[in-house]
């Protein structure tokens, strides 16, 4: 005898776009230095966030967060957050760890982008540089993983010709 599970009714959802991607960092100054230099852009804003709603929103009542928005290619926004709290600890940076995330930027030249990131202090996962993708949906692309500030993984992909 099999049981039929009924799915709960869910309210309608109309997601229209990615609003922003948030990264918690140890030093907002260091993070801004990397992202502004790497992307060749200026932050949209930087401010200390300390409104009463914020602590309720993020789960740390009374918190202050030094925050900035940086424009990403294609119109998305990168939000950088430095929580002003004692006792913060680094998340494990290994890409296989649950909860680990990465940002992937599409670039026109993976080798040049890799060299630029390394010159700005990024640590390559594959020291020889970008790898050629030889199978799957990105076959023909060139890609690289690098560790940037705070152990964050930055991926760059140069799409296959014609894609």
Kindly label every feature range from the protein language model.
Residues 1-14, 18-26, 66-76, 91-163:
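Vicinal oxygen chelate
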Residues 49-56, 85-91, 130-142:
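A cross-kingdom feature marking solvent-exposed beta-strand/loop segments within repeated
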Residues 84-86, 161-162:
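Short, solvent-exposed aromatic-acidic interface loops
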């Amino acid at each position: 005898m099999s049981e039929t599970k009924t799915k709960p009714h869910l309210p309608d959802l109309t997601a229209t776009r990615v609003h922003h991607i948030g990264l918690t960092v140890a030093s907002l100054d260091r993070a801004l230095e990397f992202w502004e230099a790497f992307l060749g852009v200026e932050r949209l804003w930087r401010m200390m966030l300390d409104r009463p709603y914020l602590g309720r929103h993020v789960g740390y009542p009374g918190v202050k967060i030094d925050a900035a928005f940086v424009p990403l290619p294609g119109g998305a926004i990168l939000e950088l957050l430095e929580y002003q709290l004692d006792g913060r600890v680094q998340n494990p940076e290994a890409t296989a760890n649950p909860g680990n995330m990465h940002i992937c930027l599409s670039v026109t030249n993976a080798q040049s982008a890799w060299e630029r990131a390394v010159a700005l202090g990024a640590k390559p996962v594959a020291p020889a540089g970008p790898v050629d993708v030889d199978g799957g949906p990105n076959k023909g692309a060139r890609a690289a993983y690098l560790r940037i500030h705070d152990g964050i993984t930055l991926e760059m992909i140069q799409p296959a010709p014609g894609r």
